[in-house]
A protein has these predicted regions:
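ATP-binding N-terminal substructure of ATP-dependent carboxylate-amine bond-forming enzymes
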Residues: 1-128, 135, 366, 372, ...
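A short beta-strand motif that forms the metal-chelation/ATP-contact edge
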Residues: 23, 159, 200, 276-285
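A conserved helix-loop-beta module that forms one wall/lid of the active-site cleft
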Residues: 109-176
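ATP-grasp fold ATP-binding core
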Residues: 133, 153-171, 183-199, 212-216, ...
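Short acidic-glycine loop/turn motifs at beta-strand connectors
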Residues: 173, 202-209, 272-275, 340, ...
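ATP-dependent carboxylate/phosphate-activation module, predominantly the ATP-grasp catalytic core
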Residues: 192-195, 199-260, 271, 283-307, ...
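A short glycine-rich, hydrophobically flanked beta-strand micro-motif that places a catalytic Asp/Glu
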Residues: 261-273, 320-323, 413
């Protein structure tokens, strides 16, 4: 009987099992990107500056203190980590747009599933971006370079050129420090209103740009201990009037045919009290909107992004991708909780760590990690009927997480 049973068991030759396509996610924080990569059916590896516990639970992570390669020696931590994955494609996460030296190095010797370095540098030069948009008759916020300051009357913002997450932004008035008058900063006319993001996907070849969707951004929320201009969350999908969306779609097209962007990219913009949108920044890589729109709308955007550079890899990976679970409500939000003071984290790691749906808490530090005041602690997620409902639930979730945070005395000078 045992022999007969073995005859009818299905035969699986493990030597013929094809591996999932591998990809290296590189950026300041890669957890959301890695989870999107998993949902798309790829096998991810990561290099980032946080190496959070939930990221480590699902992939191999190479932690680095900085993405800078100002010291271009083989002992540079970033270059050493990248060298271990020299044979697999690289996917850019947040912060990479501010590392021109690293982008140049990678483009010379690695396969990149992302926009070209030249295109990234164009849209990250504020004056060049504003002049380019004005040349095609788009309304833009006035921009001035750091060595040509406007009046200190509070109607301008001074921003780092290599900015991320709203860090380093201040109002340009009499209290602003003089060290902002350099080539590393620029001035942008101030406009008040809610902040939104739009997400696009563009093939490298000529053709239309796909408008993916809109999200509402949370900025400077005291409930999350965020600084005045600090990015601290996202809710989506968002809906805006048709005439506003039409203009946003046009911006997405211009960023491809005039500046050369491809793959996933996003823009941040403010809608003023008159209902007019004003572009404030371009993010030439996958953004926080990717995760929210994937989970809230049942999409697999990472595979669509990869298809812009390698259609066969994208098709192969989709064979491994599980169907997305149904949304739990109309909107999904993510909030970033910041440390109000120096603290130690005891946030428990969920078991198991989930990547195919929104976790209650993510970006979880290793137990006992000390986090300095003003630094991000973790992310919380919530579903709801609209932006206000989701935001209230996110703030409540943040209060629950704070129960696992312990104040720590400042380190001696």
């Amino acid at each position: 009987m045992h022999y007969i049973k073995k005859m009818f068991e299905p035969f699986v030759d493990e030597s013929l099992t094809l591996p999932r396509p591998r990809v290296l996610v590189l950026g300041a924080s890669t957890r959301a990107g890695v989870f999107s990569v998993l949902r798309a059916g790829f096998e991810p590896y990561a290099i980032d500056q946080f190496a959070d516990a939930d990221l480590r639970a699902l992939t191999t992570v190479e932690p680095v203190e900085s993405l800078s390669i100002a010291t271009k020696s083989t002992k540079n931590p970033v270059l050493s980590a990248i060298q271990k994955y020299s044979d697999i494609p690289i996917l850019y996460a947040g912060g990479m747009e501010n590392q021109p030296q690293l982008l140049e190095h990678l483009e010379r010797g690695h396969l990149i599933w992302g926009a070209d370095r030249a295109a990234i540098e164009q849209v990250r030069q504020p004056k060049h971006l504003a002049d380019g948009l004005a040349h095609v008759r788009q309304r833009v916020l006035p921009v001035q370079v750091g060595n040509d300051p406007p009046p200190r009357d509070g109607t301008w913002l001074v921003k780092p050129i290599a900015s991320a997450g709203g860090r380093g932004i201040t109002v340009w008035d009499e209290s602003a420090p003089h060290d902002k008058l350099d080539g590393k900063h620029y001035f942008q006319k101030r406009v008040e209103g809610p902040v939104y993001s739009a997400l696009f996907i563009a093939e490298k070849t000529p053709g239309d740009v796909r408008f993916v969707g809109l999200t509402r951004q949370l900025v400077g929320c005291p409930e999350l201990h965020a600084g005045q201009f600090a990015w601290c969350g996202i809710v989506g999908p968002a809906i805006l009037p048709v005439e506003v969306e039409f203009l946003i779609r046009r911006w997405g097209n211009i960023l491809k045919w005039k500046f050369g962007l491809s793959g996933l990219y996003g823009i941040d913009f403010i809608v003023d009290e008159a209902g007019a949108p004003w572009l404030i920044e371009v993010n030439p890589r996958m953004t926080g909107s990717v995760e929210i729109l994937e989970l809230a709308c049942g999409m697999q955007l990472l595979a669509d992004h990869v298809a812009c550079y390698d259609s066969s890899a994208a098709s192969f990976a989709r064979e491994f991708a599980a169907p997305p679970p149904p949304p739990q409500d109309d909107r999904l939000g993510r909030a970033i909780l910041y440390a109000p003071f120096r603290l130690k984290s005891h946030i428990p790691l969920p078991q198991p760590v989930v990547w195919n749906t929104a976790p209650p808490v993510a970006d979880i530090p290793e137990p006992g990690s000390v986090i300095e005041a003003g630094q991000p602690v973790c992310s919380v997620y919530a579903w709801g009927a609209d932006v206000d409902d989701v935001t209230a639930k996110l703030f409540a979730a943040a209060r629950q997480v704070e129960r696992h945070l312990e104040p720590v005395a400042d380190s001696p000078e």
